[in-house]
Design a protein with these regions (language model features):
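Hydrophobic core
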Residues: 31-39
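N-terminal intrinsically disordered, acidic low-complexity segments at the extreme N-terminus
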Residues: 1-10
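Cell-envelope and extracellular/periplasmic
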Residues: 25, 38-333
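N-terminal Sec-pathway targeting helices
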Residues: 13-32
């Protein structure tokens, strides 16, 4: 997951705010936020949540990855020779519309070589096109799990067609997608554009966590930002959309660096526990696959990203979860 600001770089290679100054700013920010929300008449629980979120950014915000749009992290714009199809013709109860976001393993970092053959489409920049391997709109230009999953969904009869909207960004932390992160705007703008085009998401797939394991977020801190992200998504997709939170934290420790050695791989059970605890079937939030278990270290092509074999397994693992969480088309707010 190389980038100008690579969260797999050693701590000595990153700028840090002096501890006391950062703490002072964080305390001041918390106090100001508490006064503001109290004055606004928000419930005590919301005041507490806002304070917790502010504390996470006060502690980790200076180490938030900087997401670039160049090199291996450039957004794939799609094959210019692939003709666009009528997006309006895809809308309907027999089409799954799935928003995908998170970090690199939800983007286009899988080994190349899979060509979707059934009615599987992507939406990017207002255009719908047939999907072959990589999905336009996500970072990198290799292969994708989602083209594989799309074929499986159509083959199963769960839906007649699948439209993926993939905005995953390699190297991103949940902090980037949270209230104070630069990718929040991308998330909100994408959902707004889908609404304007009459493409209400039926599903949302979130796969992310490796960056935050490296950054050292605690389970409680991760849960605080995840709750904020899920709340934002729910407010924009409506109550009928199924939201899936994958479990993911495993990464190759760059201090060790030997991708052939299992001892060089680290995971964060507390982050995985926070991802699992986010599930609430009563509100249509479900657990996705646990890729820490599903994709072991030897099935990662560069120490981080899924091999084609792992992507096949990841796609297959979604199917029983989707059947359990099957939904009708919701109404966007």
């Amino acid at each position: 997951m190389p980038s100008r600001f690579d969260f797999f770089s050693g701590p000595g290679e990153r700028p840090f705010t002096p501890r006391l100054a950062r703490l002072a700013r964080g305390v001041a920010g918390l106090a100001a936020l508490t006064l503001f929300v109290a004055a606004a008449g928000l419930p005590a629980r919301e005041v507490a949540r806002a304070g917790e979120l502010d504390a996470v950014y006060a502690r980790h915000g200076n180490n938030m990855p900087v997401i670039t749009n160049d090199g291996d992290l450039a957004v794939y714009e799609g094959d210019p020779g692939e003709p666009a199809v009528d997006c309006a013709g895809l809308a309907g109860p027999r089409t799954m519309v799935a928003l995908v976001f998170g970090q690199s393993n939800a983007a286009n970092t899988v080994d190349r070589g899979y060509d979707a053959t059934l009615p599987v489409y992507s939406w990017h920049d207002g255009q719908c096109k047939r999907v072959h391997d990589a999905l336009p709109g996500a970072s990198s230009a290799n292969g994708s799990t989602w083209s594989r999953l799309g074929d499986r969904i159509v083959t199963s009869g769960l839906y007649d067609a699948v439209l993926f909207v993939d905005i995953a960004r390699g190297g991103s932390s949940i902090l980037n997608w949270g209230a104070k992160g630069g990718l929040r705007a991308l998330l909100v703008e994408t959902l707004g554009a889908l609404r304007e085009n009459g493409l209400a998401p039926t599903h949302v797939f979130f796969h992310q966590g490796e960056a935050d394991c490296y950054l050292g977020l605690s389970g409680k801190e991760y849960a605080s930002v995840l709750q904020d992200v899920l709340g934002e998504v729910r407010s924009r997709v409506g109550e009928g959309c199924d939201i899936f939170v994958s479990r993911a934290s495993l990464f190759l420790d760059p201090v060790c660096g030997d991708r052939q050695s299992p001892v060089c791989y680290k995971s964060c059970p507390a982050i995985v526990a926070a991802q699992t605890a986010a599930a609430d079937p009563g509100t249509r939030i479900f657990s996705g696959p646990n890729t820490d278990l599903l994709v072991p270290w030897f099935d990662r092509n560069d120490g981080y990203h899924f091999t084609s074999r792992a992507a096949d397994r990841f796609a297959a693992a979604w199917m029983p979860l989707l059947v359990r969480g099957e939904t009708s088309v919701p109404t966007l707010h």
